[in-house]
Swiss-Prot record:
<dbReference type="GO" id="GO:0008270">
    <property type="term" value="F:zinc ion binding"/>
</dbReference>
<feature type="compositionally biased region" description="Polar residues">
    <location>
        <begin position="251"/>
        <end position="260"/>
    </location>
</feature>
<dbReference type="InterPro" id="IPR051979">
    <property type="entry name" value="B-box_zinc_finger"/>
</dbReference>
<keyword id="KW-0862">Zinc</keyword>
<feature type="binding site">
    <location>
        <position position="28"/>
    </location>
    <ligand>
        <name>Zn(2+) 1</name>
    </ligand>
</feature>
<feature type="binding site">
    <location>
        <position position="57"/>
    </location>
    <ligand>
        <name>Zn(2+) 2</name>
    </ligand>
</feature>
<feature type="region of interest" description="Disordered">
    <location>
        <begin position="206"/>
        <end position="299"/>
    </location>
</feature>
<feature type="region of interest" description="Disordered">
    <location>
        <begin position="143"/>
        <end position="181"/>
    </location>
</feature>
<keyword id="KW-0479">Metal-binding</keyword>
<protein>
    <recommendedName>
        <fullName>B-box zinc finger protein 22</fullName>
    </recommendedName>
</protein>
<dbReference type="InterPro" id="IPR049808">
    <property type="entry name" value="CONSTANS-like_Bbox1"/>
</dbReference>
<dbReference type="GO" id="GO:0005634">
    <property type="term" value="C:nucleus"/>
</dbReference>
<comment type="function">
    <text>Acts as a positive regulator of seedling photomorphogenesis and light-regulated inhibition of hypocotyl elongation, independently and in concert with HY5 and BBX21. Acts as a positive regulator of de-etiolation and influences chloroplast biogenesis and function through regulation of genes encoding chloroplast proteins. Acts downstream of COP1 and plays an important role in early and long-term adjustment of the shade avoidance syndrome (SAS) responses in natural environments.</text>
</comment>
<feature type="binding site">
    <location>
        <position position="5"/>
    </location>
    <ligand>
        <name>Zn(2+) 1</name>
    </ligand>
</feature>
<feature type="zinc finger region" description="B box-type 1; atypical">
    <location>
        <begin position="5"/>
        <end position="47"/>
    </location>
</feature>
<keyword id="KW-0804">Transcription</keyword>
<feature type="compositionally biased region" description="Polar residues">
    <location>
        <begin position="164"/>
        <end position="181"/>
    </location>
</feature>
Length: 299
């Protein structure tokens, strides 16, 4: 791409005058800047990419200038450009151009050491190694002895029961899902497990409809006598109550009539019966079906 000279508008521009803000060819540049000494001091930037000389920064006069600020009309290096155009929002809005022939590349950013490093072999071993808590030697020996004793008890088919004193402990046979397997009476099991506060005849009254063979089988224990006495008392109460505890509404028969209909069979025991007086002849029969003797004819 070629830039046309702003003065003659015919030749190719070779320099850019920062003071005049114009692109000039070699002929126009010599003609304009040779007129007086003041014009000869104008800063001019070559537009040819093959130019080997790079002008210095107008601020520090040490580093090479890469940026041209249109408002300040000065060539600036990177350091001076940042220092000047970051003071306030007004100067940061200045238009700046990159000089011709300057190649721009991405600046490598040093990110520094990574905060999250890859896990080392030591970290991996620490993650995979299980946590083991150190146990004192006496406690460890006691724990091993207790664990070994529990294994032996499980192999023998017994489970530890309640402790009678500090040295000895009772052992109960294993209980299956159905019933107990062993010769220990039921009352001993209830005392061991603290079930003596319950009613001892609860199971017996629950199974009251079973056969008498269960009662004779429970006669071996001391509680069977209490169960039998409770059964006898229950039978006496049933006999006194008539054997039935259901409620019934008493039925009152219809009142008797003069014709003998609806007369009770045992009216002298009936509390509701009121006899009807129909004639002067005294009634001596005990039932309504009894016939009164015929009157004798008088001759």
């Amino acid at each position: 791409m070629k830039i046309q000279c702003n003065v003659c508008e015919a030749a190719e521009a070779t320099v850019l005058c920062c003071a005049d803000e114009a692109a000039l060819c070699w002929a126009c540049d010599e003609k304009i800047h040779a007129a007086n000494k003041l014009a000869g001091k104008h800063q001019r930037v070559p537009l040819s990419a093959s130019a080997s000389s790079i002008p210095k920064c107008d601020i520090c006069q040490e580093a090479s200038g890469f940026f041209f600020c249109l408002q300040d009309r000065a060539l600036l290096c990177r350091k001076c450009d940042v220092a000047i155009h970051t003071v306030n929002p007004h100067v940061s809005a200045h238009q700046r151009f990159l000089l011709t022939g300057i190649k721009v590349g991405l600046e490598s950013i040093d990110t520094g050491p990574s905060t999250k490093s890859s896990p080392t072999n030591d970290d991996k071993t620490m993650e995979t190694k299980p946590f083991v808590q150190s146990i004192p030697e006496p406690q460890k020996m006691a724990f091993d002895h207790h664990h070994h004793q529990q294994q032996q008890e499980q192999q023998e088919g017994v489970i530890p029961g309640t402790k009678v004193n500090d040295q000895t402990s009772t052992k109960l046979p294993l209980v299956s899902s159905g019933s107990t397997t062993g010769s220990i009476p039921q009352w001993q099991i209830e005392e061991i497990f603290g079930l003596t506060d319950f009613d001892q005849s609860y199971e017996y009254m629950e199974n009251n409809g079973s056969s008498k063979a269960d009662t004779s089988r429970r006669g071996d224990s001391d509680s069977s006598s209490m169960m039998r006495s409770a059964e006898e008392d229950g039978e006496d109460n049933n006999n006194c109550l008539g054997g039935e505890t259901s409620w019934a509404v008493p039925q009152i028969q219809s009142p008797p009539t003069a014709s003998g209909l609806n007369w009770p069979k045992h009216f002298h025991h009936h509390s509701v019966f009121v006899p009807d007086i129909t004639s002067s002849t005294p009634y001596t029969g005990s039932s309504p079906n009894q016939r009164v003797g015929k009157r004798r004819r008088r001759f």
